[in-house]
Amino acid sequence: PALVRSLKLQKRAARVGFDWPNILQVLEKIEEETKELVEAKELESQEKINEEFGDLVFSIVNLGRHLGVDSEEALKQTNRKFINRFKFVEDTIRSQGGKIENTTLEEMETLWQKAKNS
């Protein structure tokens, strides 16, 4: 998987000293990459958007490495959490006789927060 490859590349670079010395600098890099992604979106260049999105994900994996987080496992956990919460939203709407496609974003967000807090 690409997340695992990113981590390996970063570890290899870090072994020879090509690494940010602290978390603050990693966060600054993430902020920089986020701004570049927004700029690419404004240009409406899908190629540039893809490039900047990849740079942002790579930087986030680097943050995970600095924090001792396994990015692959963290994302798997987040996927499971999303599945459970979204299922709660769907099930709640159905139990109230509604259809999710007729539910407003605001109503779904309210249910999402309820799922998140339970």
Please place each PLM-identified region on the residue numbering.
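Flexible "arm" and connector segments at domain edges
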Residues: 1-53, 57-118
